[in-house]
């Protein structure tokens, strides 16, 4: 595929070059601003919306009244009466089943948007300029690998087509049939509730046919899936950039292609079919930044590059890195060695002291055993226990003590001793 500049070849209905050339209109060199295209597309698309709203009575067609406080239930209004499940249920609130929605929609919403005329023209210029770049067109998914040239211009004889078979044959000759096959392959069922609203099927977009006069071309192309037809005097950004994305594959008739300079003008001459309008200017005449920066004018103004290399030294922690510590303090090695030796010496002293104490304790216990005349018995842990000495039981405490305690014997009543008066016999 060729992207010819500044002349464009005109192709015949047989798909071959007719030998005629057309000068590339200046609008194809306009700045491409995807942000403006997206903004204009978003706002213009809102103008197709139809007002909708819920009923003003929805959710309020019941006799409900709050029960007030003191019943340990929420204070939401409740349906009156009895004998049915509905009685006592909450009503009116947006949190209730059968209640109204929050902030019910109204028909007096601001549905439509006004867009500046200059902005709309800028967006159309950007969309047309993007349609001439094969990379952008292919990024949109159009199958233009075999198309001979972009922009693709055909003779005006095509505007007189009235049969669909003629249009299909033309697309085959121009190698644009692959884009139509892509549309057929993409036909599928819509997701969501649009299926119930006469929008069951969706499909991809195909080529956009732009003509100057309708001599039957609309009837010839309108039944081919994915095809969009536009009059060059009534270009629509919603069709040139579907979804707000630039890069639609466009097929032009020769007269429509020649008319673009009159519609949008050149930078040297204003548009003749529009009142005081000219193409938007580029912010940069030359967008090749590398070429600009390497130009002798800029290089002359720049200073020579500094080639001195400053190596960044990694600072290491001397408390964790012995090599760095020895660089800072060579005596640190001697200090560390002395510390290790002192720790080893202290450890040996502790071990010897513990061994001497154990030996003294052993000798003392042997002495006591010899005095008692009993042979000492060595226990499991190396301690000597006296033979014949019973181990005292620990006193029981709590419930165990109460369970094992023997009941005290019942005390007999003490017999009274006779007093001196009782001992004396009666006279």
Curated annotation (Swiss-Prot):
Where does this protein have compositionally biased stretches of type Basic residues? 377-397
Annotated GO MF terms: structural constituent of ribosome
* Omega-N-methylarginine: modified positions: 97
Q: Which residues carry this modification: Citrulline?
A: 300
Q: Where exactly is the Glycyl lysine isopeptide (Lys-Gly) (interchain with G-Cter in SUMO2) cross-link placed along the chain?
A: 239, 327
Tell me the Gene Ontology biological-process terms attached to this UniProt entry.
translation
Sum up the protein's function in the record's words.
Answer: Component of the large ribosomal subunit. The ribosome is a large ribonucleoprotein complex responsible for the synthesis of proteins in the cell.
Q: Which family does it belong to?
A: Belongs to the universal ribosomal protein uL4 family.
Q: Which residues carry this modification: Phosphoserine?
A: 290, 295, 365
What is the designated name of this protein? Answer: Large ribosomal subunit protein uL4
Subunit-level organization: Component of the large ribosomal subunit. May bind IPO9 with low affinity. Interacts with RBM3.
Give all N6-acetyllysine modified positions.
Answer: 14, 106, 259, 333, 353, 364
What's a GO cellular component annotated to this UniProt protein?
Answer: ribonucleoprotein complex
Q: Which UniProt keywords apply?
A: Acetylation, Citrullination, Cytoplasm, Isopeptide bond, Methylation, Phosphoprotein, Ribonucleoprotein, Ribosomal protein, Ubl conjugation
Residues recorded with modification N-acetylalanine: 2
Q: Which organism is it from?
A: Pongo abelii
Glycyl lysine isopeptide (Lys-Gly) (interchain with G-Cter in SUMO1) cross-link site: 364
Primary location: cytoplasm
Residues that bear Phosphothreonine: 266
Q: Which domain of life is it from?
A: Eukaryota
